[in-house]
Swiss-Prot record:
Gene for this chain: acpP
Protein name in the entry: Acyl carrier protein
Molecular function in Gene Ontology: acyl binding; acyl carrier activity
Species for this entry: Treponema pallidum (strain Nichols)
PTM text: 4'-phosphopantetheine is transferred from CoA to a specific serine of apo-ACP by AcpS. This modification is essential for activity because fatty acids are bound in thioester linkage to the sulfhydryl of the prosthetic group.
O-(pantetheine 4'-phosphoryl)serine carried by residues: 37
A GO BP annotation: lipid A biosynthetic process
Chief location: cytoplasm
Domain Carrier: 2-77
One cellular component term from this protein's GO annotations in UniProt: cytosol
Length: 78
């Protein structure tokens, strides 16, 4: 696991109040991790702050899995 995923996993665990070990790239934010729309908004904001990037609303709405968010973030920080 790379550093970016580990940072992102820690944020997801904190914001969604789940165990880090339960989060994989294939975890669904809503189905597996129990996120609702407010959780998703707070998570996107936390990622923007932590990573120093901006995630457009229309893009954030496309994040179904942790992988979706990870791939977008990776494209912005590398």
């Amino acid at each position: 696991m790379d550093e970016l995923f580990l940072r992102m996993r820690a944020l997801v665990a904190e914001k969604l109040e789940v165990e880090e070990a339960s989060i994989t790239l294939d975890s669904s934010f809503r189905g597996d991790l129990g996120a609702d729309s407010l959780d998703t908004y707070e998570l996107v904001y936390a990622i923007e702050e932590e990573m120093g990037i901006t995630i457009p609303d229309e893009k954030a709405n496309e994040f179904e899995t942790v992988r979706d968010a990870y791939e977008f973030i990776k494209s912005k920080v590398t």
